[in-house]
Amino acid sequence: MVSVAEIRQAQRAEGPATILAIGTANPPNRVDQSTYPDYYFRITNSDHMTELKEKFQRMCDKSMIKTRYMYLNEEILKENPNMCAYMAPSLDARQDMVVVEVPKLGKEAAVKAIKEWGQPKSKITHLIFCTTSGVDMPGADYQLTKQLGLRPYVKRYMMYQQGCFAGGTVLRLAKDLAENNKGARVLVVCSEITAVTFRGPSDTHLDSLVGQALFGDGAAAVIVGSDPIPQVEKPLYELVWTAQTIAPDSEGAIDGHLREVGLTFHLLKDVPGIVSKNIDKALFEAFNPLNISDYNSIFWIAHPGGPAILDQVEQKLGLKPEKMKATRDVLSEYGNMSSACVLFILDEMRRKSAENGHKTTGEGLEWGVLFGFGPGLTIETVVLHSVAI
């Protein structure tokens, strides 16, 4: 008779969960940040709000963003004028877009990740799909399973309405699945489309304008599995340790509410302060067991909620400017793509590490950290171990 302990032992992988491939995708519509205020106020029929437009121009100029990608273009917005108002019933129109476009963009990223992985998609055992928009049943996980032609018995996990911390959440979940299911190969997809949050300006709700200045569309996919097959699968990063915490005294710092008018975002001004105040504790818990206290000695992947968050974290920890380079480069080129951002940064870092002749996927360093920050205020922490190039 086989014991439960023996069954449990046989079910577990031997090594740590490892990222084996990364793919990214964006809609074709590329938006120039320097001219976006003119476009935004024109398309929302708000050119008469001259002071607010100047304020928005300053927000965009300070955002450190050069370009973003958006599914919404002028043609779509002209067909849906209610989406251009600040508070007009428009959820049906928004939902009709995102329930189609979210899995579609996710598929683009997934196809690239599967191609890099180089294994038949029939070997995918689990699917995690994450998006802040487009609640539907069956969900985007089901749609993607059908569109990719995955096996009908792939084990699916659908995560809706998570927000900007969720790039860390999906890696935490993928790690647990890969390490506790021998031979598991987890396809993780984060797909974010801002059609659910786009709205016209309001001079009484400036926090809504912050979102309009920062958010962009993008999807990223990774394959996660333990015990990579030598000469067949190419490991990129090992997922060593994960944590999630709610920052103390942070209730209401970042809120989102899905209503007839779409998804509305509300931000407290001191989000950067809350993040920087709690970053020390998160890092200590993560790296004290490794005897690491010099945070310039590790590589950094931080969700780029906005430049102020990155500036305050750098200042608080005394980080060298180059530590956040990959993070700032992704923010500059794509804007804040919510949950997908940290996966884009992982992709950027492994590519630049190879191009610049570094010895590891982590800019030549062995250990690294990945942070997600979002509604709650929730902080996700992932300790990464790089791989030799």
UniProtKB/Swiss-Prot annotation:
The active site is at residue 164. It comes from the Eukaryota. Pathway: Secondary metabolite biosynthesis; flavonoid biosynthesis. Its EC number is 2.3.1.74. Pfam families: Chal_sti_synt_C, Chal_sti_synt_N. CDD domains: CHS_like. It catalyses: (E)-4-coumaroyl-CoA + 3 malonyl-CoA + 3 H(+) = 2',4,4',6'-tetrahydroxychalcone + 3 CO2 + 4 CoA. InterPro entries: Chalcone/stilbene_synt_C (IPR012328), Chalcone/stilbene_synt_N (IPR001099), Chalcone/stilbene_synthase_AS (IPR018088), Polyketide_synthase_type-III (IPR011141), Thiolase-like (IPR016039). PROSITE patterns: CHALCONE_SYNTH. GO terms for biological process: flavonoid biosynthetic process; polyketide biosynthetic process. Keywords: Acyltransferase, Flavonoid biosynthesis, Transferase. One of its GO terms (molecular function) is naringenin-chalcone synthase activity. The primary product of this enzyme is 4,2',4',6'-tetrahydroxychalcone (also termed naringenin-chalcone or chalcone) which can under specific conditions spontaneously isomerize into naringenin. Belongs to the thiolase-like superfamily. Chalcone/stilbene synthases family. This is Chalcone synthase 7. The gene is CHS7.
